[in-house]
Every structure is written in C-alpha cells, then in structure tokens.
Design a protein with these regions (language model features):
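Bacterial N-terminal signal peptides
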Residues: 10-20
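Bacterial N-terminal signal peptides that target proteins for export
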Residues: 1-9
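Solvent-exposed adhesion/ligand-recognition segments of exported proteins
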Residues: 21-149
Length: 149
C-alpha cells in the first residue's frame, strides 16, 4: 500500500509539473534575440517586445505563448508607464534606440496551441496586435486592452 501511494504521488507531481509549464510565455531566443519575459511588481507576466523594423512592426517569436488568468502585459513603451494590470512598469529596454511599435506580431514556433485565458494589455503606444499560431489558439475569458500614453 505504501509503495502504491508513493507512485500515485510521484505521477501526480509529474503531471502537475507538466501543466504548470504550459502556463508560460517562452521566447524562441533562436529567432527573437532580444525578446524578454519578466514580471511586473504584482507578478503579472511582462513581455519586453522586440524593437520594430522601419515599418513599425515588432515581430516576436515564442516557443510557447499562453496567458493565464493573471493576464500579460506587452511593453510598447520607451518610458516608465502605468499599466492597468501591472501598475507602474519600466520602459522597454529594446525600444531605447527606436520608436515604439505600430504593429505587434506574436508568432508561436512551438508545437502546442496557445491558451489565452486572461487579459492581454499593450502598455505604452497604441498598436495593432496579431497572435499567430499554426497549431491553434484556445480562447476562454480573454480580453485585450490597448492603452495609449
């Protein structure tokens, strides 16, 4: 009986670990060299997007892009700004030598579909937003806010 209980706990812990890994935003650093995922002071994931090209397009590639109930902030601000879901956040260091993006493309290169179960916010300059995942996008309770400073 003791051995069976230990095995059951071990299996449970393994699946718990797998489920928790799927709730993340993971950059594909082989493609997006400067894309950074951090956290706001309250723990909400904070994405410092790539600098835009000459057309104002910030192309960001992820192995995984999932937004849980806490939400996520896409930082499109050069300066300190107040976000709705994370409070005050620092300017995006990737934008210090460029302008803010007019379009943000979030592309998923991994094999899993994206799960969007929370609020996504573009903090800083207003921008068009595209989420592309060839494996699919599951949306439940999602919202998108585009704030302009």
């Amino acid at each position: 009986m003791k051995g069976s209980f230990k095995r059951l706990i071990a299996i449970f812990m393994l699946f718990l670990h797998i489920v928790s890994l799927s709730d993340r935003i993971v950059p594909d650093n082989g493609v997006s060299k400067n894309l950074q995922v951090d956290k706001a002071a309250n723990g909400v994931p904070l994405v410092n997007i790539e600098a835009p090209d000459n057309n104002g397009i910030s192309h960001n590639v992820y192995k995984e892009y999932n937004v849980d109930g806490r939400g996520a902030i896409l930082n499109n601000s050069k300066d300190l700004t107040n976000s709705q879901s994370g409070g005050l956040i620092y300017g995006n260091p990737n934008l210090q030598n460029s302008s803010e993006a007019s379009t943000i493309i979030n592309e998923v290169s991994g094999v899993n579909r994206s799960r969007i179960e929370g609020y996504q916010e573009i903090a800083g300059k207003k921008a068009n937003y595209i989420l592309a995942n060839p494996n699919g996008i599951y949306v439940n309770g999602a919202d998108l806010s585009i704030l302009e400073i």
